């Protein structure tokens, strides 16, 4: 079985902790749901793995290149992925996996109406109602199945 590891982050706000960098090593793809707040951090992430990212409400003055916009749609592991900063802007009818940020509060769930996997990885920098966190999704490349989706608490 061939798998792909997607490491999911959001709301790093210009700081990539050593614990976060260590967790990201070995990722096949890094998905960032906005509020990167640092072009140099974005470049650092790109040195670890390919990055699929969207802009957050604090990113508009930064230039991360032409592929980073308010909404990121990409295909990976046979699945349609959608990444936006605000959960309210997700269109769950048009994706299999939906990633959001902004609240700094982690969760992972399946939408009961569409069956879409929805994740907010929380924030590794400024968590709210939780500890610093990120997400991880493992997909089967042959079947397009999500094998696991979890929130990882950093620093434990």
Task: Please report, for each region that a protein language model flagged, where it lies by residue.
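N-terminal active-site segment of His-dependent metallophosphoesterases
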Residues: 1-51, 59-70, 131-133
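Binuclear metal-dependent phosphoesterase catalytic core
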Residues: 2-5, 73-76, 112, 117-156
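Active-site environment of divalent metal-dependent phosphoester hydrolases
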Residues: 14-18, 37-41, 58-64, 88-92, ...
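Structured loop/turn residues at beta-strand edges in well-structured enzyme cores
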Residues: 25, 93, 144
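Glycine-rich loops and low-complexity Gly/Arg-rich segments
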Residues: 31-36, 55-58, 77-81, 106-109, ...
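Helix-adjacent hinge/juxtasegments
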Residues: 52-89
């Amino acid at each position: 079985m061939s798998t792909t590891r997607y490491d999911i982050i959001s709301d790093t706000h210009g700081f990539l902790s050593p614990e976060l960098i260590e967790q990201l090593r070995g990722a096949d793809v890094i998905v960032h749901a906005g509020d990167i707040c640092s072009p140099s951090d974005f470049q650092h992430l790109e040195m670890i793995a390919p990055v699929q990212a969207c802009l957050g409400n604090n990113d508009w003055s930064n230039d991360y290149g032409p592929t980073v916009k308010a909404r990121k749609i990409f295909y990976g592991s046979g699945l349609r992925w959608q990444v936006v900063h605000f959960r309210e802007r997700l269109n769950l009818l048009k994706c299999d996996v939906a990633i959001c940020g902004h609240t700094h509060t982690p969760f992972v769930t399946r939408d009961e109406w569409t069956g879409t996997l929805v994740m907010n990885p929380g924030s590794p920098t400024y968590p709210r109602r939780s500890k610093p966190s990120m997400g991880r999704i493992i997909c089967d490349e042959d079947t397009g199945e999500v094998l696991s989706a979890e929130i990882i608490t950093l620093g434990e």
